[in-house]
Amino acid sequence: MLQSRYSNDAKALQALEIDDAIEKVRTETQKAALINKQNNAKFARMPFVFAMYRMGVKKHMAKNFPHEGWKTEWVRCDGKEIHFNLRSCLYYDICVENGCPELCQVYCENDNIAFSGLMPKIRFERAGTIGEGAACCDFHFINAKKKADKN
């Protein structure tokens, strides 16, 4: 009985330590996401920002998210929307390998922060991420001007 209680206490302590570690990683990575948000906000002030974003996105993805760690599926890249899915993610794979898959969600959250800097000209949307249990990480960058023109 005593050993069982000790085992439960140890598991509870370990869970608290993991939660604390995840929160510390969240705090630190959000700092970088906020810097990216500011940089995106500066970029978004430029005229024709969606066209420029669209012209550079595939090169950016190939350079910064290479095929060795990420499997990118391009769905759409036109004047209305840039949409691609990541079918595999190096961040998720590393988190799983190290026994902490829940950590990956922290990195996923930072996309929402960083890309919010593109508003109001470019709206970022997503239905889910691999880290949250979805089949893929979907990235939708919507040209807000084109969307507004439709209505």
Regions found by a protein language model. Give the residues of each.
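Terminal "cap-and-tail" regions of soluble proteins that handle hydrophobic small molecules
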Residues: Q3-S4, E23, K147-N151
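N-terminal, charged low-complexity regulatory/assembly segments
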Residues: M1-A12
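C-terminal non-catalytic interaction appendages of large macromolecular assemblies
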Residues: K80, L90-I94, N98-N151
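A short, highly charged nucleic-acid-interacting micro-segment common to nuclease
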Residues: M1-Q3, M46, P101
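Amphipathic interaction/junction segments at domain boundaries or subunit interfaces
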Residues: A12-G99, N112
